[in-house]
A protein has these predicted regions:
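Protein kinase catalytic-loop region centered on the HRD/HxD motif
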Residues: 203-216
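Conserved catalytic-loop aspartate of Hanks-type protein kinases
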Residues: 279
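Intrinsically disordered, low-complexity cytosolic regulatory tails
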Residues: 61-63, 302, 332-343, 349-413
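Pre-DFG segment of protein kinase catalytic domains
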Residues: 235-238
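Membrane-proximal cytoplasmic juxtamembrane segment of single-pass receptors
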Residues: 16-166, 171-203, 249-255, 261, ...
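Activation segment
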Residues: 241-243, 271-276
Length: 413
């Protein structure tokens, strides 16, 4: 009597008893489906991300390769563009009285901008087929090189048939002018200024060879390509012949040498082997010229005594101080002068591997240490005991430079 009747049980509307076997399987199926769907979604998402990243990397690599190709093809940040009428007005239409000098690629004129700024304008020769290549090479390097001992390029002008490069103006002209033009000028070049010039050129070479983003070989370093500011600080100029190397590259071979005899190393002049040691040879010649006040002669030049040979003979005899520029009188520190002469002789040794690097030279110039190696016989030695350079051999390179003017037409680039 306590249990409800079947009719009353139906009225209570109890839920039907679960069917345990089939219900459990259904829930598992739903759960498995959800998991598999989520897993598939995650897999697809990972695949899509991987594809996207791969494409991004590929694009970046292609852009990097394109950038490398552009860099190797000498692209550069475009310099300021000057108009031809502006530069004509600044230089008095390239008036002869504004002419500062002349080189293998053209003439240099002094100019004055409307704001009063003094400038130097190099007017490249229109007859030279190499003019545009030299201009492009110089602009490419100017966009990537910045140092207090390098001349700064301000801009360029390519209008009509003119190819003009605008530089900062340096009032003390070139080292060549101060050393060799007149006795009066040399008297104003005391030892302190000479030592400052030697040290500044060395620091400029250190930057070009080891510290800049490019490894640059100048290839035509000489006194006329060293300009001096109002404080007599030297600035290396004229990078028309310069060659940029990869950071891991130390030397190259050219078909024809291009530069100025008397400043070209023997391995470069005769074999076309160019390296940082070629520049160091040129630097050594300049150092000896600054110390002695005398110009080095070209090898094979008739009736000419090589400055390098004379300094070497005096050095071996212990009388090197006799080679000091007479215009200095006795107003110079003898030890420092002999130290510079020693460094110059180390740099002009015949074998490139014996010449010091720019970093070594900078260290030697700033150090009072005398523990330096003994220089061997210089290249192009023409002394009584050394094998003289024959005139016929030297003449094979005479077409490289004439009367100290750089020639580059013989070397295709």
């Amino acid at each position: 009597s306590i249990l409800p009747s079947p009719s009353s049980r139906a009225a209570l509307n109890y839920p039907p008893a679960p069917v345990h076997g089939k219900g459990r399987q259904s829930k598992r199926a739903v759960l498995a489906g959800a998991i598999s769907t989520g897993t598939l979604f995650l897999v697809l998402l990972v695949v899509l991300v991987c594809v996207y990243m791969k494409r991004t990397r590929t694009g970046a690599n292609e852009r990097a390769r394109d950038g490398a190709r552009e860099d190797s093809s000498n692209t550069y940040v475009s310099p300021e563009q000057f108009t031809l009428p502006l530069l004509r007005a600044a230089t008095g239409n390239f008036a002869p009285e504004n002419k500062l000098g002349e080189g293998g690629f053209g003439q240099v004129f002094k100019g004055k901008m409307p704001n009063g700024q003094a400038i130097a304008v190099k007017r490249l020769s229109q007859s030279s087929s190499q003019g545009f290549h030299e201009l492009k090479n110089e602009l490419v390097l100017a966009a990537k090189l910045r140092h207090r001992n390098l001349v700064q390029i301000l801009g360029v002008c390519l209008e009509e048939k003119e190819k003009l490069i605008v530089y900062e103006y340096l009032p003390n002209r070139s080292l060549d002018t101060l050393l060799f033009d007149s006795e009066r000028r040399r008297r104003g070049l005391d030892w302190r200024k000479r030592h400052t010039i030697i040290c500044g050129i060395a620091r400029g070479l250190l930057y070009l060879h080891e510290e800049s983003q490019l490894r640059v070989i100048h290839r035509d370093l000489k006194p006329s390509n060293v300009l001096l500011d109002e404080h007599m600080n030297p600035k290396i100029s004229d990078f028309g012949l310069a060659r940029a190397f990869r950071p891991d590259q130390s030397r190259d071979v050219t078909k024809r040498a291009a530069g100025t005899l008397g400043y070209m190393s023997p391995e470069y002049a005769y074999c076309g082997h160019v390296s940082v040691k070629s520049d160091m040879y040129s630097f050594g010649v300049i150092v000896l010229e600054v110390v002695t006040g005398r110009r080095n002669s070209s090898p094979g030049q008739d009736n000419a005594n090589s400055l390098l040979s004379e300094v070497w003979e005096k050095w071996r005899a212990g009388t090197a101080a006799e080679m000091a520029d007479a215009s200095l009188g006795d107003q110079y520190p003898r030890a420092q002068m002999l130290s510079c002469m020693h460094i110059g002789l180390l740099c002009v040794q015949k074998k490139p591997e014996l010449r010091p690097d720019a970093s070594e030279v900078v260290l030697m110039l700033s150090s009072q240490s005398r523990s330096r190696r003994t220089p061997s016989r210089p290249a192009f030695y023409a002394g009584s005991t050394g094998g003289a350079v024959t005139a016929s051999r030297a003449r094979r390179s005479e077409n490289v430079s004439k009367n100290g003017v750089t020639m580059s037409e013989l070397e295709p680039r």
